[in-house]
UniProtKB/Swiss-Prot annotation:
It comes from Streptococcus mutans serotype c (strain ATCC 700610 / UA159). Responsible for channeling the electrons from the oxidation of dihydroorotate from the FMN redox center in the PyrD type B subunit to the ultimate electron acceptor NAD(+). The gene is pyrK. [2Fe-2S] cluster binds at C220, C225, C228, C244. FAD binds at R51, P52, I53, S54, I68, Y69, R70, G75, T76. Pathway: Pyrimidine metabolism; UMP biosynthesis via de novo pathway; orotate from (S)-dihydroorotate (NAD(+) route): step 1/1. This is Dihydroorotate dehydrogenase B (NAD(+)), electron transfer subunit.
Amino acid sequence: MILKENLTVVSQREIAPRIFEMVLKGDMVAQMQAGQFLHIRVPDASKLLRRPISIADINKEAQEATIIYRIEGRGTAIFSQLKAGDKLDCLGPQGNGFDLSVIDKGQKALIIGGGIGVPPLLEVAKQLCKKGVEAYAVLGFANKDAVILEEKMSQYATVVVTTDDGSYGQKGYVSTVVDNLDFLADAIYACGAPGMLKYVDKKFEKHPHAYLSTEERMACGMGACYACVVHVKGQEDAQNLRVCEDGPIFETGQIILD
C-alpha cells in the first residue's frame, strides 16, 4: 500500500562529489522492501513533479531509511541543502521490489551495480546475508572519486570494484569481471546505467531468477499517467508496463531496454 507521510531528516552527508546520503525517519519505513523507492516532493512551490529516489538501506527497528541520490538539477540540489529536523513530503514505499524469495541459505547470488544504481542493491545484499546466501557483488564506477558503498556492501558480500579509467580496483567495466566468473549464480540482481542493464539482460536472458531495476522519468508516480512505460518484448504494439507500478524491477528478457 502506498502511503503519504512527512518523513523527518535525521542526517545528511556528501559521500562522493554531488552524491548525498540522507537518512529519513517515519512510520512508513515499516512497509519498505529492498528495491522499492520513494516519490519525494521538492520543498519548492515552483517544482511540481516529485523525484523518485531508491531506498538504499532499511532499519525498521529504528524506523529509519537511507536514500542516496546524485544532484542532477535544481530539485535534487534543494534536497542537498536539507538539515536534520527538516521534513520531506513522501509517497511510498512504491514499486514491486526485488524478489528475494527465490534464493535460500547456502546458494549463491550475483549482485551487479553501476554508479548511482548501486544504492538499492545495498539492502538486497543485507537481506541475502541474513538468509545465509553467499553474495558476490561487482560494482562499476567511472573513477575512484565516484566509488560509493564499497565498505558497507563488503559487510554483506564479497565485493569487486571496477573503474572505467583504472584509477581504483580493476580497470574496465562490470562485464570484464562478470564474463570471467567461475560460478553460476542461483539469482542475479542488477541496477545501473542503460548500457549495463542491456548487457545483463542479454547475458542472463534465459536465467530463471535474474532481475533488473530500471529507471524512467515519472510524473504522477501512481500508474495513472503512463509517462514511465516500457515495452514488453514480443508485444511491442500490444502491452506496456509502468515502471512506477509494475516495476521498477523486471525479469531479464521481459522488457525492451532503450
